[in-house]
Amino acid sequence: QKTAYEIPKRDWSSDVCSSDLLNFMYDRADLTADRLITYRQICVQVARELGIEVTFMPKPTVGIMGNGCHHNLSLWKDGANAFADPGRRELHITDTAMAALGGLLEHAAESMAVYASTVNSYKRYWDAGQFAPSRVDWGLDDRSRSVRVSASGRLELKLPDSIVNPYLSHALIAAALEDGLARGIDPGPAPEPGVPGPERFAPLPLTLGDAVERFATSAWVRGALGDDLTDLYAEFKRDEWARFCGAVTDWEMTMYRSWVP
């Protein structure tokens, strides 16, 4: 299907509570990034005209699934998907895809300041049981993992949220895939569903402050984005984190206002 704005979409459905789920048809990374930016702007404008509000806030409500932006990806060469074996019917990925997957997992922690770019982003990972992963792992059609083989020849990265900058996330994903292929990084076996796997890779930072430091001190990130962009992005995010740390929240008032030690 195509919209009037030439944004190809595969399907749309009502997700949980007041959330909606839209799947874009796969395309080149740059075009998909353009379409995501355009689509979010369209949503805001249409909501304004209808007198309602749309939010892409990653975690607006506790106990309910947040707003994710799962990135489904594959690599193609000469019109063929390098992540799938032609004619093979069972759920699978190729050795090429395994190495690319290894790169995604290897660099997941360093990329979190982009995948989850706000203070609120990390509330998705702390609210257990909502299919937002908090470990660096993968699985075959396992929605609890940070990377899921959702179909033969396709990887689904579940870490990014709906406020993500797709140009930055796509740049880091491409760099991670490239490094995985170049080094032949082994992602290890997929754990059984519902069973925590071994910690083969650096753990995810679970606050924006930790994520920014991992990002800013990563030689790999600097190689992917360049020093100028890395430093500028880190400066903005450190400021955001500092302002949050200096704010007094409703939770603190409820917890400590009447506290008598």
Question: Which ranges hold each PLM region?
Answer:
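Short coil/turn segments at secondary-structure boundaries
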Residues: 15, 115-119, 226-231
